[in-house]
Every structure is written in structure tokens, then in C-alpha cells.
From Swiss-Prot:
Its cofactor is FAD. This is Dehydrogenase str4. FAD binds at residues 45-46, 66-67, 123-126, 585, 596-597. The active site is at residue 552. Induction: Induced in strobilurin-producing conditions (on CGC medium after 6 days of growth). It comes from Strobilurus tenacellus. Belongs to the GMC oxidoreductase family. Pathway: Mycotoxin biosynthesis. GO terms for molecular function: flavin adenine dinucleotide binding; oxidoreductase activity, acting on CH-OH group of donors.
């Protein structure tokens, strides 16, 4: 058991040890313990925002309970480009899905942050509001009040935008300037400038429009450069570093505890409508269990995996699923259903002639990059892994080709339009200026890029189910990749478009590509092949063999108007339960058309106002 660097180290200071039945609410409440108005369960991207905003009111006491570790002193989290070093470390939940037929029975690794700040402490630091139409789609699902015009003030409230001279076409007036989540667009790293400009121009040359700022009312559809969550000193902005600052952590009405695993919400059984009374947690699998009450509300912010797990362990979930584990049903709700993730057919590696960051993977180059970051807060280590991205629609003319139409995939597989609106994208292409080395290799002997595509609006839905009644046992995650034919077609189309951009000048002149390659065993094959002659069947086979998660799951406890198809209402209150809300990516009614971290922050900002009664 530990704590953040300013608060709790002993659970006995804020909770009571359980000696009897945890189902006896009156017995638990009879024990004297510190009282909290609000308990936020989960100190991830949303939880840190909620704890900070709710504790602004000195009249209320707030407890933030995080299952993972403190973020204090985690160097690889502070350095923006060092995030791969956190994958499969103790700061990662290191989830693994079940095997899926769509990817040849393989499982998929799901990284999720296991420290304060959650996945915002281990992700790629891209700042993206996604498409304005995403929020219109939320309203259509019954999430009244969540349209973009209502969300925009909360994006701006969170933003602390810092203009940069490398990006003169960005209008700072469209962004917030004093928010905790510092955002910037620059600088463009000097060594990757030429190849970055080549990618932009080649994307334009195949018909994709240029977008200077992905985060405006116009939306992201087009090619451009990502904004980044990075402080001016070159360090990562996470929900923890942005919202749980030393001054916030010093508030006498805020308690932050880490390494406390939420096991279940205690619900009253003597009222007509069940009410959340408190939280049961433990500090180790076989260790002491503790109880802490909440006088006003509990807010579940345990993430797309943790939130449905805690709900089901508390008796809130599909009745049939709860019955499998002999859990009494408090509310029969579709918890764990409607799970969606951004699927990727796998990395598409490209050999280059020059102009990449591969030098930082070598000992001397890495040392020089570290020195530049440590003393000046500059250089590749202060930058994003992904420099350029294209957001496109599958029905865009870019996909047309006189010799081999991009819609050939739709001849075999019917494409379903899952876009949020007429201008919202359903495919993302990305380019990172270095070659990601395979397992067991430190670096490649030549320069290159790592590229890939994301299926932004999948037609496939998955589930989160319990593995057991023990909160320490990871739940069963099944994103159901490529279970819908449309997802297969879009994956084929996206891979083909990416390969076409790579063979379009001026980008092609920077690359070392063969005329064509039929060596499907090569990790370079998807971009080595000729996009005009490679078959749909071959691209599909590659996607099934190499497909993986991009770490953007949502909607496992989604918001909506009906208890038959959603878990929480438009105020994030769990249907049929008093005093319990959900606030994290699990409450998204539908998947968003981009990187979700900024959306989670904005949702939490609005949720705080809903709880305060001012939204």
C-alpha cells in the first residue's frame, strides 16, 4: 500500500477494516471512520479531473482511490517519447484479450495505465478532440445535452494552449489558454522536417486535403500534424500532472490513495431504490479488506475494463452473467456490452533513405537525445511518436483508382457506414519517423518509419465479462475484432491507401522501396507491395495475422436513454441506482473518431459540473 507523494499511506487513516460480512451495510456503517462526501473510484484520466474539480469546493471532502501506483518519480512517464518503456511494466495493467476468430484465434495485448493519471500517463500524448459529429451521434443514442456545442466549452476549459511559430496557421482563439491540460503544436523536430513535409505533400497529392488544426469546429478529416499534451519544459502532461498539482494535493479536503483495489460498491438493500453507500477495497489479493462510506455519491472512473468489472461484482450487470458467478442481481443492465476498440491491421514498416529518428535507438544517439531533453526540454524525446496523420472517409474519392478501385474490398464485403456524420472520418493513417524494432532486436541497421491505420468506427462490438468473483482476477475481454465484414473491407482499403501514399512523390523519393514484393513473410511487405496489384485476399490475410489493439477502448458501460441498451443516463447516473455515477471512456455512447484521451478529460470536466449542479 502506498500513496501519492503528498497524501495517504495507511488505509486505516481513511477507512475501516472489515471483520464481518461485507453485505451487512448497517454493520459496516456502525464503525467510526472518516466521512467523505464524494468517493472517486479510479485515479485515471477521468478520475484525476474529477478529484481536482470536486475538491475546489472546500465545503466537501473528496477521496480518490487508485488501484495502481503513484505517478511521482516515474521517469519514463515524464518523457513523452519514452512511453513504450512503460508497456508491460508494473505501471501497465498488461491486459490480454481472449482469442478471437477474426484474428486467427490470437489474443491481443491491451495496455492500460496502472498509476495516477491512468492511460494518460503512458499513452502517446496526442491531443485530439475527435470529430464534432461524434457528439451528435451521442445525442442520437439518448445522451441528451452532450452535443458538441455543449462539449466545446469543456475542451476549452481543459486546454492551456501554447502557440508556436512553426504553426502560424493555428488560430489560438479557437482554444482555451489557461486550462490544466497544456497543449501545443510544435516545434516540428528539425531532423524529421523534410520527411514530415514529404508525407504531408504526398497525402495532398493523392487527394487528401490539408488540415492545419485537427481540433476545430470543422473537424479532423484531412492530413495534418497532431497537437500534443506536453508542458513547455518538454515533459508529459497527464491527467495527474495537469490536474493533481502540488497545490491541489495540498487541499485539506482531498485525500488521494493509491494501491487500493476496488472490490465492490456497497449498495443499500432496505430502500425502494438501491443507493450506493460506500466502497470496499483491498491492498493485496489475500490482504485485509476495508470499507469507506460516501455520504453524497460514488463516481466510478476505473476505466473501460475496471468500471464494468466493479459494477458486476456489485450486482449491477446482465442477470445471466451475474448468475454464472452467484452474484445477486441488484440491477439488470447491459454492463460490459457494446465494447468497441480501434482495430489496427498491425504496423506497416517502411525503409527510408534518410530523415528519421532511428538514431535515438542506438546508444550514442539515445544519450545525446536524453541530454538535449534533460537540459533543454527539447529534441525527439519531447515530441510525439506520431508526427503526421490522415483522417479520411471510406467513401472519399481518394479511394478511387482507375486500375483497381479501392472499393474492391466492398465487392466481397459489404461496407457499413458507421461514420458519426457526413464529414466525420472512419479511417486514420499515421506515420512515425522511426522503425519500431521487433521483440528481441534493439534497432534496425537502416533508417525507416512505422506507419499504420486505425479503424475508427468499427461495426464490430465486443464484451467485458467476469472471470470470477475476485476483483484481483482480470476480466475476460473480447473486442470481437473483424467479426463484421465492413471492418475487414475498411482495413483493406486503409492499408491500400497507406501503401499508395508511400509510393507517391515526394514521399516516395525519401523511401527505399522495391518495385514490388510478394514476400508476405517480410515485416515490410504491406508497404513493399504494389498497392495497385496486391489482392484484397492478401491484405485481409495480413490483417488477420498481425491485427492488434491501438489502446482506444470505449463504451462498456455506455450512456443512453434506455436501461435496456445503456448503463447510465445523460447525467451519468447508473439507471435505477441512487448515488452512483460512471465517468470514463466506458460511458461513451459510441466510439469516437480519433484518439479519446482529450474527450475523456472533457467528459470529466462536464461531469464535475453535473455533480455540482451547475451544468
Amino acid at each position: 500500500m502506498g500513496a501519492s507523494h503528498s497524501t495517504v499511506s495507511d488505509p486505516h487513516r481513511f477507512a475501516v477494516a472489515i471483520t464481518g460480512s461485507d453485505d451487512d451495510v448497517r454493520s459496516l456503517q456502525a464503525h467510526p471512520t472518516k466521512s467523505y462526501d464524494y468517493i472517486v473510484v479510479g485515479g485515471g484520466t477521468a478520475g484525476c479531473v474529477l478529484a481536482s474539480r470536486l475538491s475546489e469546493d472546500s465545503r466537501v471532502n473528496v477521496l480518490l482511490v487508485e488501484a495502481g501506483y503513484s505517478n511521482h518519480g516515474v521517469t519514463n512517464s515524464i518523457i513523452p517519447l519514452a512511453f513504450p518503456m512503460l508497456m508491460k511494466s508494473k505501471y501497465d495493467w498488461n491486459y490480454e484479450t481472449v482469442g478471437m476468430a477474426g484474428i486467427n484465434g490470437r489474443t491481443s495485448y491491451w495496455p492500460r495505465g496502472r498509476l495516477l493519471g491512468g492511460t494518460s500517463s503512458i499513452n502517446g500524448s496526442m491531443y485530439h478532440r475527435c470529430a464534432p459529429e461524434d457528439f451528435s451521434a451521442w445525442v442520437e443514442e439518448g445522451a441528451k445535452g452532450w452535443e458538441y456545442e455543449n462539449m466545446k466549452p469543456y475542451f476549452r476549459k481543459a486546454e492551456g494552449y501554447n502557440p508556436h511559430p512553426d504553426h502560424p496557421n493555428i488560430d489560438p482563439a479557437l482554444h482555451g489558454t489557461v486550462g490544466p491540460a497544456k497543449v501545443t503544436h510544435g516545434p516540428i523536430a528539425f531532423l524529421s522536417q523534410p520527411i514530415t513535409k514529404d508525407i504531408l505533400q504526398s497525402s495532398i497529392n493523392v487527394g487528401i486535403r490539408q488540415v492545419h488544426d485537427f481540433n476545430t469546429d470543422v473537424g479532423p478529416t484531412g492530413v495534418g500534424l497532431f497537437a500534443r499534451n506536453v508542458f513547455p519544459n518538454g515533459t508529459r502532461v497527464s491527467a495527474a500532472t495537469g490536474y493533481l498539482t502540488p497545490s491541489v494535493l495540498a487541499r485539506p479536503n482531498l485525500t488521494v490513495a493509491v494501491e487500493c483495489m476496488a472490490e465492490k460498491i456497497v449498495l443499500s438493500s432496505d430502500e425502494k431504490v438501491p443507493r450506493a453507500k460506500g466502497l470496499i477495497f483491498s491492498t493485496s489479493r489475500d490482504g485485509q479488506r476495508f470499507y469507506v462510506p460516501a455520504s453524497k455519491e460514488l463516481i466510478l472512473s476505473s476505466g473501460v475494463i475496471g468500471t464494468p468489472q466493479v459494477l458486476m461484482l456489485s450486482g449491477i450487470g446482465p442477470a445471466a452473467e451475474l448468475a454464472k458467478h452467484n452474484i445477486p442481481v441488484v440491477r439488470d443492465l447491459p454492463v460490459g456490452e457494446y465494447l468497441q476498440d480501434h482495430f489496427s491491421p498491425g504496423p506497416m514498416l517502411i525503409r527510408a533513405k534518410k530523415g528519421t529518428w532511428d538514431f535515438i535507438l542506438r546508444p550514442l544517439g539515445g544519450l545525446l537525445a536524453m541530454v538535449k531533453w534533460f537540459f533543454f526540454g527539447k529534441g525527439p524525446l519531447s515530441s510525439l511518436s506520431v508526427q503526421v496523420a490522415c483522417f479520411v472517409r471510406s467513401d472519399d474519392k481518394t479511394f478511387a483508382h482507375p486500375q483497381l478501385p479501392m472499393h474492391d474490398g466492398a465487392k466481397k464485403y459489404q461496407v457499413k457506414d458507421c461514420c458519426s456524420g457526413p464529414t466525420a472520418p472512419d479511417i486514420e493513417l499515421f506515420f512515425a519517423p522511426f522503425l519500431a524494432p521487433p521483440l528481441g532486436m534493439k534497432y534496425w541497421p537502416f533508417p525507416g518509419l512505422t506507419s499504420g491505420m486505425l479503424l475508427l468506427k468499427p461495426a464490430s462490438y465486443g464484451t467485458v465479462k467476469l472471470a470470477s468473483r475476485n476483483a484481483w482476477d482480470y476480466p475476460l475481454i473480447d473486442p470481437n475484432y473483424l467479426s463484421h465484414e465492413s471492418d475487414i473491407a475498411l482495413s483493406i482499403m486503409g492499408m491500400r491507401l497507406l501503401a499508395r501514399i508511400a509510393r507517391t512523390k515526394p514521399f516516395a523519393d525519401s523511401l527505399d522501396l522495391p518495385e514490388d514484393s510478394d514476400d508476405k513473410t517480410s515485416v515490410f511487405w504491406p508497404t513493399d507491395c504494389n498497392p495497385d496489384t496486391v489482392s484484397d485476399d492478401d491484405l485481409e490475410a495480413w490483417a488477420r495475422l498481425h491485427g492488434q489493439s491501438t489502446g482506444h477502448p470505449t463504451s462498456s458501460a455506455r450512456m443512453g436513454g434506455s436501461p435496456s441498451t445503456s448503463v447510465v443516463d445523460s447525467k451519468l447516473k447508473v439507471h435505477g441506482v441512487e448515488g452512483l455515477r460512471v465517468c470514463d471512456a466506458s460511458c461513451f455512447p459510441t466510439q469516437v473518431s480519433g484518439h479519446p484521451a482529450a474527450v475523456v478529460v472533457a467528459v470529466a470536466e462536464r461531469a464535475a459540473d453535473l455533480i455540482k449542479g451547475v451544468a
